[in-house]
Amino acid sequence: MVDIRINEILGRDYLLCMVERPDIPTAKEKIEFIEVPGRENGSLTKKNGYEDVTFKIDFNLLEDYNIKPLLRRIKAWLLNAKTLSFTDDNVYRKIKSVEIGSIANEIEEYGQFEVTFVADPFEYAILQPLEITKTTTLVNSGTKYSLPKITIHGSGSITVTINDVSFLIKNVNSSVVIDSELKEAYSNTTPMNSNMIGNFPTFSEGANTIKWTGTVTKLQIDPRWRYL
């Protein structure tokens, strides 16, 4: 039976069941059409990313005791959702907001309710971080370019090149994190954006060759492959 996983905790851990697996829509691309007087080829288009995805899940709960205390714990678990996945797939979604509908609980041993989730437009592959110590080619299995998190272990000035696009990070002392999603470079709690030259790295669909110059012992990479 398919179960839901929120923040790495399964619904069954709360004795909770989905009525059925939800249908989750594909994110819509945000496109702006710009009319240009005299242009014969129609309007210009400006693409502005993707809309968030909204979906609903019905849950029920049936036990042989008063479930009201358990329902309070379940609500806290749902309202603090950061990630959501299902046990029949190896992807997860990043949750932005949660709304819990009215709970039908006239019988104290039974509860049924609907939850509305708003999620990031993408599905993300469930992967362990990768570790590399030499020039390596990674294959982006996703359907869009990804925004990785790269931890560089080394010292001094280091240049990292991905498919002939490079960035430089200076004054590295032991390690530095380059987070392309947050657009942040940092070492522990020290901001390092001012020490970085170049754009934050991305992984294109398909093959991505990673190499570097400088004193580096290893790179730890969370590639964040993503799918629409």
Map each language-model feature to its residues.
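Solvent-exposed edge beta-strands and adjacent loop segments
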Residues: 1-54, 89-103
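A short, compositionally biased
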Residues: 1-2, 77-81, 152-156
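Short, acidic/charged, Gly/Pro-enriched secondary-structure junctions
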Residues: 5, 60-100
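Surface-exposed loop/edge segments in extracytoplasmic proteins
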Residues: 13, 85, 91-95, 159-161, ...
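Short beta-strand and beta-hairpin "edge-sheet" elements
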Residues: 25-26, 83-128
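Oligomerization/assembly interface segments of phage tail-like spikes and tubes
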Residues: 38, 42-65, 109-122, 208
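Solvent-exposed loop and beta-edge segments used for protein-protein assembly and interaction
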Residues: 49-51, 76-78, 107-111, 142-144, ...
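Intrinsically disordered, low-complexity segments enriched in serine, threonine, and glycine
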Residues: 124-228
